């Protein structure tokens, strides 16, 4: 990720497009959005929100974010619908420590747990230098990689999932609120400048982004756009 960040400020031409399905098959990894995040202005100073929850299945069974505690029953039912019990989950990755992303961690106490830059394995804290831009490669994960994407908070992380039918999927938490979020994410950001750099870095490598509070979307780069136009002509 360090090399990505070094090039993050260079221009990138791309388009986004909605993804029609919450399931992305692939080998060695498939991705399923169990709960789609949302954020609603309900009037006054009140918002109603919950974070997306994503299941990655392959050599490991990985859950990214756990939603808020108010979504416990929905999360358990969604896992059950996929034939997954909480005890089957090998790794839980929380993109940051806000309550709508970590609210059900207690369901997965046996799993390796990564919350922001803090990694726990078998009840022990394991040091990892995310602040220096060192990615965390999940052992046995066949390319699953956690990278630092600070900005929304000072220690946000994202999971890179290669080997799907649509290419590399990035589960990005609140790095992206939703497709086409424009500048609306900036008031929610602890450090908008760093977040802008993190967003640019992820856009360079992602074919699909799963945001924190909206449906997944495709990222179509300039070269891909040119190829599509050639095919259409």
UniProtKB/Swiss-Prot annotation:
Keywords: Cytoplasm, Hydrolase, Metal-binding, Nucleus, Zinc. Its main location: cytoplasm. It is an enzyme of class 3 (hydrolase). One of its GO terms (biological process) is positive regulation of G1/S transition of mitotic cell cycle. GO terms for cellular component: cytoplasm; cytosol; nucleus. It is found in: Cytoplasm, Cytosol; Nucleus. One of its GO terms (molecular function) is metal ion binding. Binds 2 Zn(2+) ions per subunit. Zn(2+) 2 binds at residues 100-101, 174, 213. Its EC number is 3.1.27.-. It holds the Pfam family Lactamase_B. CDD domains: MBLAC1-like_MBL-fold. InterPro entries: MBLAC1, Metallo-B-lactamas, RibonucZ/Hydroxyglut_hydro. It comes from the Eukaryota. It catalyses: a ribonucleotidyl-ribonucleotide-RNA + H2O = a 3'-end ribonucleotide-RNA + a 5'-end 5'-phospho-ribonucleoside-RNA + H(+). Its cofactor is Zn(2+). Zn(2+) 1 binds at residues 96, 98, 152, 174. Belongs to the metallo-beta-lactamase superfamily. Glyoxalase II family. Homodimer. Endoribonuclease that catalyzes the hydrolysis of histone-coding pre-mRNA 3'-end. Involved in histone pre-mRNA processing during the S-phase of the cell cycle, which is required for entering/progressing through S-phase. Cleaves histone pre-mRNA at a major and a minor cleavage site after the 5'-ACCCA-3' and the 5'-ACCCACA-3' sequence, respectively, and located downstream of the stem-loop. May require the presence of the HDE element located at the histone pre-RNA 3'-end to avoid non-specific cleavage. Contains four of the five characteristic MBL-fold metal-binding motifs, with two waters completing metal coordination. This is Metallo-beta-lactamase domain-containing protein 1. It comes from Xenopus laevis. The lineage of its organism: Eukaryota, Metazoa, Chordata, Craniata, Vertebrata. The gene is mblac1.
């Amino acid at each position: 990720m360090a090399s990505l960040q070094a090039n993050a400020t260079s221009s990138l031409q791309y388009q986004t497009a909605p993804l029609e399905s919450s399931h992305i098959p692939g080998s060695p990894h498939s991705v399923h959005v169990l709960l789609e995040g949302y954020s609603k202005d309900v009037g006054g100073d009140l918002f109603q929100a919950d974070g997306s929850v994503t299941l990655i299945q392959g050599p490991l069974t990985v859950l990214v974010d756990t939603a808020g505690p108010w979504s416990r029953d929905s999360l358990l039912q969604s896992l059950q619908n996929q034939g997954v019990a909480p005890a089957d989950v090998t790794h839980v990755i929380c993109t940051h420590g806000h309550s709508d992303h970590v609210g059900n961690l207690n369901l997965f106490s046996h799993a390796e747990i990564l919350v922001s830059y803090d990694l726990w394995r078998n009840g022990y804290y394991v040091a990892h230098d995310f602040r220096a831009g060192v990615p965390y490669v999940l052992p046995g994960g066949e390319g699953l990689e956690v990278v630092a994407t600070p900005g929304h908070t000072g220690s946000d992380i994202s999971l890179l999932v290669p080997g799907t039918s649509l290419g590399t999927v990035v589960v990005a938490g609140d790095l992206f609120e939703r497709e086409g979020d424009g500048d609306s994410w900036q008031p929610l950001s602890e450090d908008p400048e760093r977040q802008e750099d993190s967003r640019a870095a992820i856009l360079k490598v992602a074919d699909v982004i799963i945001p924190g509070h909206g449906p997944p979307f495709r990222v179509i780069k300039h070269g891909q756009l040119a190829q599509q136009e050639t095919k259409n002509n």
